[in-house]
Structures are given as structure tokens and as C-alpha cells.
Amino acid sequence: MYAQAYFDYDSKKSGGVTMSHLRFGKKAIKSTYLIKQANFVACHNPSYVRKYNMVQELVPGGTFLLNCSWSPEELETHLPGQVKRYIAENDIQFYTIDGIKIGKEIGLGGRINTVLQSAFFKLAAIIPEETAIELMKAAAKATYGKKGDKIVQMNYDAIAVSYTHLRAHETDQYL
């Protein structure tokens, strides 16, 4: 498996917008341009769904993951009409996860990186699930090992819990 990553940051050091352009393939990737049509788009900050037109960059049949606490009824209110319409008309697979709630319950506070990373690997299915879990756990151990076993375990918990807290949403009602 080959991967290519390009990250586009705004001028804020913390709390700003980051667009991650990731490519995966069985052959070496030598593309020098940003992704214009994606198979997967995630929005980690629910306020961005009104600010930025993210779903328009999804190919038909692509996957959109929104990190939010909204119920299906609240989604109806919070999602802009053009977002709902694009999702429905283009057969977008739409999922939500409440990363903040998961992080707080596990003890990670507002840190959602492991939660959303786990959700990405589950939904994108670019490598087998068991392999993804093993690799994420190894990365958590390498990244947080010096902070202690408790922090490592909280990240292991985030990996496991994220898989079960993804919510798929029917989108026919958006037509």
C-alpha cells in the first residue's frame, strides 16, 4: 500500500482549518496536484458545515463523516439545504460521530484525533479492520507511551469505541 499526503493549513497556529489531501494506492503515487474529487470527506468541526462547501468535493457514492452531537432531527435543522440536496442526489454515504462526547467519556477531554482517525479507517476501508486497529494501537503506544500507560489505554479505548459509535444516516428525506 502506498500513500501520499499533503496538508493545507490556514494562518492560525491552533484551532484553524486544515485540509488533508490523502491518496492511497497499490502503486507509487506521484501526483502533484490537490484532490478535487474525493471519495471521503470528514468535517471535524460542526460549525464548518455552514461555512465551507465540503460535500461538493465528494464523488457520487462517496462518504461524508461529520463530527457533531446532533440528532437526526437536529441534522435536519443544522445542515444547509444545498448540503442535504447534494448528499441525497449523489448517493453520499453520510455518517456522524460525537467525537467530543467520546473523548470526554474516555478521559481524553476535547481531544478527538484518535476518535476521528479510527472512524476514518473504519469507513474508508483502505486496509483490513484488524490491521487498522493494530497499526493505530502501535501508533498510540509510540506517540503517547512516554505519557504513561493510562494515556495509552485511553487512546486504545478511543479506537475501540469509535468503531461502535458511528451513526449512518438515511438521506432519502433530503430529496
How does the language model describe each region?
Residues 165, 172-175:
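Single conserved hydrophobic/aromatic residue that forms the stacking wall/gate
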Residues 1-167:
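Active-site cofactor/cluster-binding pocket
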